[in-house]
């Protein structure tokens, strides 16, 4: 494992599946970056130390605040965008190890131990013994397996009719149409739509739309969009209603969230 500085998410990382290793790479970015959709044979864990990262795949959308990580399974088509200055890291896992983790993307809280292990692995010198690397790799992998999951992701449905519906919602999160209205627009009963939506996304329709709004709000806060503008962009009649929703989901107001996020980015 060697220290490297590459483009965000390392689209040009070594792409092979016959090497049994964990490759740790520290990323340092000082500007907004965006990568095109790409895939690689390694599983990838991406962590944010400062700033916010958004990751898009064919199956969904994840945001990664400071002190959080996102898991991207092998051969998953994905792209990423940072919101403001971003500093973070990646750990690449060989396919064999990746099979022991989730087969779909997930977000996790970064533990202090994981952060230190990544920095240690990324700063190894060329003469570090393989035995030392192997021992630390095992500890690093054990820590990854036991990371606490967070809910900073949103799955898209696979059914074309439902995908068209959610694509429409994501392009206009101010759309307040009810489940019944959406059901009529795609020719389903509301009961059938509710059942299929839950089966496809793991969430009820209202919860899915609320999470989409929260994730979008987090991105806009990172881009320094005023709270008033965010509220109206997301379809709320007034700022108070938006703040109440955000506090109910996140446990803090938007202003408190930004303060905490900035503090975590510094630490």
Regions found by a protein language model. Name each.
Residues 1-52:
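Generic protein-terminus/edge-of-domain signal
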Residues 35, 50-56, 69-70, 78:
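Short beta-strand segments in beta-sandwich/barrel cores
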Residues 59-74:
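Short acidic-glycine-tyrosine-enriched beta hairpin
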Residues 67, 193, 197, 241-242, ...:
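Short hydrophobic/aromatic patch on the recognition helix
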Residues 76-98, 103-105:
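Ligand-binding loop in jelly-roll beta-barrel domains
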Residues 125-186, 199-211:
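Short, Lys/Arg-enriched, Trp-marked, Pro/Gly-tolerant hinge/linker segments that flank
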Residues 180, 199-243, 259-267:
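Terminal helix-turn-helix DNA-binding modules in bacterial transcription factors
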Residues 184, 195, 199, 232-233, ...:
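Alpha-helical residues within the helix-turn-helix
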């Amino acid at each position: 494992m060697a220290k490297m500085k590459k483009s965000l998410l390392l689209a040009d990382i070594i792409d092979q599946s016959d090497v049994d290793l964990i490759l740790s790479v520290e990323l340092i970015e000082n500007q907004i970056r965006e990568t095109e959709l790409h895939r690689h044979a390694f599983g990838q864990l991406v962590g944010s130390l400062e700033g916010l990262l958004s990751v898009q795949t064919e199956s969904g959308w994840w945001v990664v605040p400071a002190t959080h990580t996102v898991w991207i399974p092998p051969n998953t088509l994905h792209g990423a965008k940072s919101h403001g200055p971003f500093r973070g890291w990646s750990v690449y896992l060989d396919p064999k190890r990746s099979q022991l983790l989730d087969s779909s993307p997930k977000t996790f809280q970064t533990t202090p131990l994981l952060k230190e292990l990544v920095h240690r692995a990324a700063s190894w010198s060329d003469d570090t013994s393989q035995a030392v690397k192997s021992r630390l790799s095992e500890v690093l992998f054990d820590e990854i397996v036991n990371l606490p999951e967070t809910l900073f992701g949103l799955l898209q449905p696979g059914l074309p009719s439902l995908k068209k519906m959610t694509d429409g919602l994501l392009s206009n999160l101010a759309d307040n149409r009810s489940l019944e209205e959406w059901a009529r627009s795609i020719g389903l009963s509301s009961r059938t739509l509710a059942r299929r939506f839950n089966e496809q996304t793991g969430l009820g329709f209202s919860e899915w739309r609320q999470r989409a709004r929260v994730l979008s709000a987090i991105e806009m806060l990172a881009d320094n969009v005023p709270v008033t503008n965010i509220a109206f962009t997301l379809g709320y009649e007034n700022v108070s209603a938006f703040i109440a929703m955000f506090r109910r989901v996140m446990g803090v107001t938007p202003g408190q969230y930004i303060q905490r996020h900035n503090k975590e980015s510094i630490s």
